[in-house]
Amino acid sequence: MASSHNVLMRLVASAYSIAQKAGTIVRCVIAEGDLGIVQKTSATDLQTKADRMVQMSICSSLSRKFPKLTIIGEEDLPPGEVDQELIEDGQSEEILKQPCPSQYSAIKEEDLVVWVDPVDGTKEYTEGLLDNVTVLIGIAYEGKAIAGIINQPYYNYQAGPDAVLGRTIWGVLGLGAFGFQLKEAPAGKHIITTTRSHSNKLVTDCIAAMNPDNVLRVGGAGNKIIQLIEGKASAYVFASPGCKKWDTCAPEVILHAVGGKLTDIHGNPLQYDKEVKHMNSAGVLAALRNYEYYASRVPESVKSALIP
């Protein structure tokens, strides 16, 4: 039995393998051809068979190994028996070799909260925009996001039949972020990435105030943060309620681990303790570099309309 002082790295190592399994499930559901789409609250708020299966897989796999965790998932699923084939009990040996940052070495299992988005970018998943899709597992301690795993099931899917499909990015504050090549957006350019399907006047007003050279409208919070760390966008601007804690927890860690910053529109850090409301009601503002420029451009009219 591994010692309890190493609980964070054991959890990250397990979540890495679980996220890879989740990516396989996402691809299998597409390959089978029946997405099992259910409309939740609106035509843009969808749930698929993949959402349901992946959440069952992640939550059941984690809770078997770490029974004292608090796990909060996007999908509201009825309790029931979980198919044994959905359980992943492996762990990344490479991650286990990494040192646990000293500030987290004494963490207890019951102090951790895990935020799960089984399929981030579900609408895009149903429309075949597969590169927008991610699986998100975020880990929080004392209300702060400290570790995150992002699986991209369809990374490389347009690179030809010989390409390796999918990748898993992971990070821990104080250790770093891994599984991708860090790249900054072109200097002097303001390339904004924002929502594809949930725009409104607040969002467009806020983006206009940034003097953008280009605006990218894509699905998925995880996908947008990946655009920041790979130099495809300079800032992620979403001046609206809509995205939830499970959308931002894992991506925030990856961004923060490489020196970026993610806050609400007012510049407040997001809170991830288990009692917190799920909605990021004051929106999201994030950048890898030059965060202060984007924060300084947010109009007062936008700030006053978004109450934290």
UniProtKB/Swiss-Prot annotation:
Residues recorded with modification Phosphoserine: S240
Tissue distribution: Highly expressed in heart, brain, spleen, lung, liver, skeletal muscle, kidney and testis.
Protein purpose: Phosphatase that converts 3'(2')-phosphoadenosine 5'-phosphate (PAP) to AMP and adenosine 3'-phosphate 5'-phosphosulfate (PAPS) to adenosine 5'-phosphosulfate (APS). Is also able to hydrolyze inositol 1,4-bisphosphate (Ins(1,4)P2) and inositol 1,3,4-trisphosphate (Ins(1,3,4)P3), but is not active on AMP, 3'-AMP, fructose-1,6-bisphosphate, Ins(1)P, Ins(2)P and Ins(1,4,5)P3. Probably prevents the toxic accumulation of PAP, a compound which inhibits a variety of proteins, including PAPS-utilizing enzymes such as sulfotransferases, and RNA processing enzymes.
Cofactor(s) recorded in Swiss-Prot or TrEMBL: Mg(2+)
Residue positions, PTM N-acetylalanine: A2
UniProt modified residues of type N6-succinyllysine: K244
Activity regulation (UniProt): Inhibited by Li(+) and Ca(2+), but not by Na(+).
GO molecular function: 3'(2'),5'-bisphosphate nucleotidase activity; inositol-1,4-bisphosphate 1-phosphatase activity; magnesium ion binding
Gene3D superfamilies on file: 3.40.190.80, Fructose-1,6-Bisphosphatase, subunit A, domain 1
Phosphothreonine sites (modified residues): T122
Catalytic reaction list: adenosine 3',5'-bisphosphate + H2O = AMP + phosphate; adenosine 2',5'-bisphosphate + H2O = AMP + phosphate; 3'-phosphoadenylyl sulfate + H2O = adenosine 5'-phosphosulfate + phosphate; 1D-myo-inositol 1,4-bisphosphate + H2O = 1D-myo-inositol 4-phosphate + phosphate
Cofactor note: Binds 3 Mg(2+) ions per subunit.
InterPro entries: CysQ/Inositol_MonoPase, Inositol_monoP_metal-BS, Inositol_monophosphatase-like, Inositol_monophosphatase_CS
Keyword GTP-binding: no
Keyword Acetylation in record: yes
Binding positions for AMP per the UniProt entry: T195, H198, G220, K224
CDD domains hit by this protein: IPPase (cd01640)
Similarity annotation: Belongs to the inositol monophosphatase superfamily.
Intrachain S-S bonds: none
Catalytic residues (UniProt): D51, T122
GO biological process: phosphatidylinositol phosphate biosynthetic process
Binding site for Mg(2+) 1: E74, D117, V119
Chain positions recorded as Mg(2+) 2 binding sites: D117, D120, D247
This enzyme's EC code(s): 3.1.3.7, 3.1.3.57
Protein name: 3'(2'),5'-bisphosphate nucleotidase 1
Keywords: Acetylation, Hydrolase, Lithium, Magnesium, Metal-binding, Phosphoprotein
